[in-house]
From Swiss-Prot:
It is a peripheral membrane protein. This is Ubiquinone biosynthesis protein COQ4, mitochondrial. Its EC number is 4.1.1.130. The gene is COQ4. It comes from Laccaria bicolor (strain S238N-H82 / ATCC MYA-4686) (Bicoloured deceiver). The keyword Lipoprotein does not apply. Component of a multi-subunit COQ enzyme complex, composed of at least COQ3, COQ4, COQ5, COQ6, COQ7 and COQ9.
Length: 297
C-alpha cells in the first residue's frame, strides 16, 4: 500500500510525469481512431483487438511499452495513483505470470483457486462472520489486522492490460491477496513495512513490479528508517520469501478456521523484525470485539 503515502520528489519530476496521467484513456482513443482509418483492414495488435474479458483493454507492444514507462514515472511521482501502480505491474509482468500460473497448476490447492477463481472483497467475504472466529485463527487475525490498519478489502484495482484471461486472474489474485501476506507476515501498512513486503514478494513470486517498488521506494524514507530497512527487514524478506511456500498457491478462503501459527509453520514463514504499528494490538482487538458484539445484538 505504498500508494497511501505521499511522495517526496522534486517538482520537476512530478511536472514531467503529468502528461502520463491520462495514458490509459489516451491509448484507448488512439486505438479507436487507428481502427477507423481508411483502408485499415488488419488488426493493430498481433494477438487480439477485442476485449477478452470485462474491463480488458488490449494493447499492442508499442502501447504496452509507452504505458509501462508512463506508469513508472507516475507511480514514482505520486504513489497514491493506484491505477498507475497497477498498470506498471501489468505491463511489466512479462513471463512471470505464466510461471506463477504453472506453480498454481502444480499445487492441488492452487488448481482449485484457478478453477473456482474466488475474489476478495467485502461482498465475497463475511467480515462479521470472521470476527466471531476463535482467537488465533486466520479469519480472526485478518479482521483484527484490517481494524488495526484501518483498511478494507475493497481497494484493489481491476486488471486491464493482460490479454490472457487466466493470467489476468493470476494477477488479480496476487493483488487481492496482498493483504493476506501482510497479515500472515505480521506487517502493518506503512512505507517501510510495505517495502519489506515488496522484497518478500519478489523473492517469493518474482514479479518485476515488486522489485521496482522495492528499489525506488526507499528514497522516501528517512536515513534512519532506510538503514533499518536494509539492515533488518530486507535480509528477513529475501530469506523468508525465498524459502517459504509460493503464496500464490494458497487458497486463503479455505483456511479461515486454521491456526495462524500452524499456517506459518506449514508455509515456512517466520515473523519479521518488530514493525511500527499505528494502532496497538490491544486497541484493535477491543474495537473488533465491540464490532462483533454490536453485530450479535
Amino acid at each position: 500500500m505504498l500508494s497511501s503515502a505521499r511522495a517526496r520528489l522534486p517538482i520537476s519530476l512530478c511536472s514531467f510525469s503529468l502528461p502520463f496521467a491520462r495514458l490509459p484513456n489516451t491509448l484507448s482513443r488512439y486505438q479507436e481512431t487507428w481502427q477507423r482509418l481508411p483502408g485499415r483492414t488488419h488488426p493493430t495488435r498481433s494477438i487480439r483487438t477485442t476485449p477478452a474479458y470485462e474491463g480488458h483493454i488490449p494493447l499492442n507492444w508499442f502501447e504496452n511499452a509507452v504505458l509501462a514507462v508512463g506508469s513508472a514515472f507516475m507511480s514514482l511521482a505520486d504513489p497514491r495513483r493506484g491505477d498507475m501502480v497497477a498498470a506498471l505491474g501489468e505491463t511489466t509482468a512479462g513471463p512471470t505470470l505464466p510461471s506463477l500460473r504453472d506453480r498454481m497448476l502444480d499445487s492441488i490447492e492452487g488448481r482449485r483457486v484457478l478453477m473456482q477463481r474466488p475474489r476478495v472483497n467485502s461482498s465475497t467475504i463475511d467480515l462479521n462472520k470472521l470476527a466471531h472466529y476463535p482467537e488465533g485463527t486466520f479469519g480472526r487475525a485478518y479482521v483484527t489486522w484490517l481494524e488495526r490498519c484501518g483498511v478494507t478489502p475493497d481497494t484493489r484495482e481491476p486488471v486491464h492490460y493482460i490479454d490472457d484471461p487466466e493470467l489476468a486472474y493470476v494477477m488479480q489474485r496476487y493483488r487481492e491477496c496482498h493483504d493476506f501476506y501482510h497479515c500472515i507476515c505480521n506487517l502493518p501498512v506503512n512505507v517501510e513495512s510495505e517495502l519489506a513486503l515488496k522484497y518478500f514478494e519478489f523473492a517469493n513470486l518474482g514479479l518485476p513490479m515488486t522489485l521496482l517498488s522495492a528499489l525506488v521506494g526507499p528514497v522516501r524514507l528517512t536515513p534512519q528508517k532506510r538503514q533499518r530497512l536494509f539492515a533488518e527487514f530486507v535480509p528477513w524478506a529475501l530469506k523468508c520469501g525465498g524459502s517459504s511456500r509460493s503464496l500464490i498457491t494458497v487458497y486463503w478462503e479455505e483456511r479461515w478456521g486454521q491456526n495462524v501459527a500452524d499456517m506459518k509453520t506449514e508455509f515456512g514463514i517466520w515473523d519479521p523484525p518488530e514493525a511500527r504499528w499505528s494502532k496497538p494490538l490491544s486497541e484493535a482487538k477491543a474495537a473488533a470485539e465491540r464490532h462483533r458484539t454490536a453485530q450479535t445484538h
